[in-house]
């Protein structure tokens, strides 16, 4: 049982930590503008594909290296939430290399196996070109050749972009394979094993190409990307650091990770989140004596605008983990104002609005304890974690049906869900003594995949938000 009421700043900040733990264009002309088929509904079945082995015409790359690239594409196509790869066999591999892919006879053989599309890659010298066959129409789409570098880190990202190009060719919307995720890694300090540090890291969506961003040798939590302008990538992020003693919000760029204080506000600050419009930051602070919800106007070019506004407070209650809706007019957050922690939504009040006139709407009703809401980029859902039969699981609240649905299963506690830009995928962290790693899941494939491993506790994942370019 958690104790929810504290009298000092240090007490509530310790509680909030425990509360959180408990609770540029690519291939622009390579495909037609019109998609082959538009089909991306969480109620639809996955589309079967066949990925033929890469055909090697002439190259200096080793077979083992090319197999690594093929495995990356395999992972991407099996985890995009829209397709799955049919089991490979020798006869189909031969079929993919028997003459022209779009030949009627070949296409009919694929159809007979209920394979909708065939993906074939040809490597010639340093270039990889991908072909997409629609077995129903015999339509063959060709992606522009891309030059491989021989550096696995760089080529992995090229393969991710190819996977997203394939997804757009089939469904008319971008995939998420080329996106990135921020998170924290907690480890003992190298020069002082008795002291723990938590630094901000960034990785590809599959957990690979991980790199450390901050170098504070202090304790960092709650990293969150600053949403980019349309057509751009995220370049900066917010996070919370204890380098000055109390928890404060910092802003840093992804290149050097050197943080600067964002707010000149007394007390502790935690859990910053930004609106998609990049003009508002919601966060939690005890500046007025209680851990309450605050709003700060923001300009990504010049910084904070004016002073922060307290937008929700409840007597003897703790507020936490805010999340904006897509148009920035509402905030979901956690409060234990009615006893146990639950998720509420408020409309952003006008400046000067009395706190007494701000009414919160209860969202989660099925479970006693709920936390860490994350509003989907399309605005239709909120993901959150909720204690279910003693285990914290990821749940989804659907605004179209006003229903709550359990997404994850299993004995491991799950926390801190974060949506991908497509509002289909989620990343979250496990939170057990011997397992604090990141997991990937989507609404069409509810068997989670672990994407991190190794030493250190990985927590607070935040999926970068991208807008159509």
Curated annotation (Swiss-Prot):
Keywords: Periplasm, Signal
Cleaved signal peptide residues: 1-30
InterPro entries from the UniProt entry: 6-blade_b-propeller_TolB-like, PD40
Protein name: Protein TolB homolog
GO cellular component: periplasmic space
Top-level taxonomic group: Bacteria
Annotated family: Belongs to the TolB family.
Pfam families listed in its UniProt record: PD40 (PF07676)
Gene3D superfamilies assigned to the protein according to its UniProt record, in alphabetical order: TolB, C-terminal domain, TolB, N-terminal domain
Localization of this protein: Periplasm
The keyword Signal is assigned to this record: yes
């Amino acid at each position: 049982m958690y104790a929810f009421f504290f009298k000092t700043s240090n007490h509530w900040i310790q509680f909030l930590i425990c509360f959180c733990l408990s609770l540029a264009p690519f291939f622009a002309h390579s495909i037609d503008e019109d998609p082959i088929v538009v089909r991306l509904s969480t109620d639809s079945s996955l589309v079967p594909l066949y990925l033929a082995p890469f055909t090697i015409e002439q190259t200096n790359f080793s077979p083992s290296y090319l197999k690594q690239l093929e495995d990356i594409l395999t992972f991407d196509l099996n985890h995009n939430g829209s397709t799955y790869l049919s089991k490979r066999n020798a006869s189909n591999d031969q079929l993919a290399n028997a003459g022209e892919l779009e030949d009627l006879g070949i296409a009919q053989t694929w159809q007979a196996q209920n394979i909708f599309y065939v993906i074939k890659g040809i490597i010639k010298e340093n270039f990889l070109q991908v072909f997409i066959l629609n077995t129903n129409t015999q339509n063959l789409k060709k992606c522009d050749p891309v030059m491989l570098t021989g550096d696995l880190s760089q080529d992995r990202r090229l393969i991710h972009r190819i996977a997203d190009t394939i997804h757009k060719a089939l469904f008319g919307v971008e995939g998420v394979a080329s996106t990135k995720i921020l998170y924290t890694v907690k480890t003992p300090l190298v020069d002082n094993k008795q002291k723990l540090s938590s630094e901000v890291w960034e990785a590809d969506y599959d957990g690979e190409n991980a790199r450390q961003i901050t170098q504070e040798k202090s304790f960092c939590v709650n990293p969150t990307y600053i949403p980019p302008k349309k057509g751009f990538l995220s370049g900066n992020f917010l996070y919370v650091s204890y380098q000055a003693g109390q928890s404060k919000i910092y802003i840093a760029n992804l290149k050097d990770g050197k943080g600067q204080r964002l707010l000149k506000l007394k007390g502790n600050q935690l859990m910053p989140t930004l609106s998609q419009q990049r003009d508002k930051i919601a966060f939690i602070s005890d500046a007025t004596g209680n851990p309450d919800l605050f709003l700060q106007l923001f300009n990504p070019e010049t910084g904070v605008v004016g002073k922060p506004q307290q937008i929700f407070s409840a007597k003897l209650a703790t507020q936490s983990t805010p999340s904006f809706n897509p148009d920035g007019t509402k905030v979901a957050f956690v409060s234990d104002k009615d006893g146990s922690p639950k998720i509420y939504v408020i409309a952003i009040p006008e400046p000067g609005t009395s706190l007494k006139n701000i009414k919160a709407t209860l969202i989660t009703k099925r479970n006693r304890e709920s936390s860490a809401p994350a509003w989907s980029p399309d605005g239709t859902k909120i993901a959150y974690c909720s204690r279910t039969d003693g285990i914290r699981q990821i749940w989804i609240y659907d605004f179209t049906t006003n229903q709550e649905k359990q997404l994850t299963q299993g004995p491991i506690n799950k926390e801190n869900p974060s949506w991908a830009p497509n509002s289909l995928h989620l990343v979250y962290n496990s939170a057990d003594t011997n397992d604090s790693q990141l997991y990937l899941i989507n609404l069409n494939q509810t068997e989670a995949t672990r994407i991190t491993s190794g030493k250190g506790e990985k927590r607070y994942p935040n999926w970068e938000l991208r807008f159509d370019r």
